[in-house]
Amino acid sequence: MKAAITGLVATVTTFLAYIVFLSYTPRVDKKSPQFTPNTVPLVGSWSFFTQKWAFWQDCVAKSQTGHFSFWLGKYHVVGVSGAAARKVFLDNPNFDFVRGATLVGHGPDFVPPLHAIFHGNFQNGRSYFQRRLVDLQKSEQLGKRLPGVTRDARGAFEALRQHASGVMNPTDACYRLVVQQACRVVCSDEIADDPAVLARTQSVLSLLMHTSSIHAVALPYLPSLAKLKRRWGRYGLSRIVTPIVQRRLQKKKDAPRHDDVVQYMLDRGDSPEWMVAFFISTLFIASANAGYLSGAMLNILAYHPDWQARIYREIKTVAAAHAPNPHAPLVDQLDTIPLDAWESFFPSIDLCFKEAIRMWVAFPMIRLNMAPHAVPIPGTDEVVPAGTFASYNSTEVHFNPELYPDPYRYDPERFREGREEFKKEVYGFVGWGQGRHPCLGMRWAKIQLNIILAYALAMYEWSGCDEKGQPSTHFDRKTDLNAPGPSLPVGLFCKYVPRKEV
């Protein structure tokens, strides 16, 4: 009995000590913006994750300066708003976006610790990850991958003819294609060309995309199925890419040579361990947003026939201008379009893509102030202290009616030269990143979307419908600005009808 009581006392004491530890609030710089009352003991301002835009609006409205402080577990975060603060947030060289991943519970990378591939050990402070991602998007490399990725796109849309209903949610079909092309552009043809391995890769990436462990920010030691699934996802990708790298290292001199990304990196003497880490991270990044956006763009064009017709005319014009035989079937002409044309000659797709990103990829961006000193917030005597996270919600600028009149309406023309109301403010559009951290994968992302839409529209006419194929002209944005992640119009269905002239 005495032993039982002693054990109970020890357990209760340990539990109370843990509660005291969790409830301890570290001191912060006195010039930090005022803390929001929207907080929960131990956890902090959890609405930052669960009610993203409502939380942000409420905090800004209650702040005299538009800036505010809040806790996420033990982490101090400063939310900033307005054009001047946005510019500092995006331009300050001490604001580290990679370490901002500490507060993001998605994907195969767990921060901290920060893997060596993300350390700025190269020229101009670039990391191995940044250096190789840029290298793989140089014209020489993308030119080598172009025949493969166009073949992937053509094959994916030709396969749709096997479905008699002609009804689909294009996000599902496009995701497999995006993963296949990503494997080819940032990893290995061995994955892209093997249906079984490609299916495994797609399955693991899908698991990671639909798993979030943001609760671990506040309670890092709490057992979590989500964290376990994320680690399992990282292990799953490692099991796919590691054997490929190892086989190449052990390959005999007279064996057939692969000309893909794995071989490119090995030929440059890259560390096999760093290569595997790079492939794991990049495959997830290259598939995540593109997997959603490509399907979403088909949804959008199906419900906007005027833009679909406009883009189709551009496709025919570009194909005829570059095809050896302008009288060949349109899909055959597409097979011969050079890289520079894929990149530069589809202005209507670019307008539609920017508007889709503006409306459906709006979220709080996070940076960590790595400077040994506080960073002043313009127009105030407030600061972002050293070692503190800063956050800016891109919804603020992307749905600002002064920059985007009638912001809830899909209107690609707002990005056309001669309008561009968003240029009234510096960094009025942040969809591709801005300042110190533009999107490093932007070049490939644009080329990839142009290729996918070109083959989709060359082969089929698309129209909106319900799940049973009944025509529908009502375009429901299905955008929840408070959602934990970007909310895209992926719940819509499309009907596709083969064109008479393909």
UniProtKB/Swiss-Prot annotation:
| Intracellular or extracellular location(s) | Membrane
Q: Where are the transmembrane segments?
A: 4-26
The GO molecular function terms of this record are: heme binding; iron ion binding; monooxygenase activity; oxidoreductase activity, acting on paired donors, with incorporation or reduction of molecular oxygen
Can you tell me which residues are glycosylated?
N393
How is this gene product used in biotechnology? Secalonic acids show unprecedented anticancer activities against various human cancer cells and might be interesting for further derivatization, targeting diseases such as cancer.
Q: Its function? A: Cytochrome P450 monooxygenase; part of the gene cluster that mediates the biosynthesis of the tetrahydroxanthone dimer secalonic acid D. The pathway begins with the synthesis of atrochrysone thioester by the polyketide synthase AacuL. The atrochrysone carboxyl ACP thioesterase AacuM then breaks the thioester bond and releases the atrochrysone carboxylic acid from AacuL. Atrochrysone carboxylic acid is decarboxylated by the decarboxylase AacuI, and oxidized by the anthrone oxygenase AacuG to yield emodin. Emodin is then reduced to emodin hydroquinone by a yet unidentified oxidoreductase.
What's the protein name?
A: Cytochrome P450 monooxygenase AacuE
- What organism does this protein naturally occur in? Aspergillus aculeatus (strain ATCC 16872 / CBS 172.66 / WB 5094)
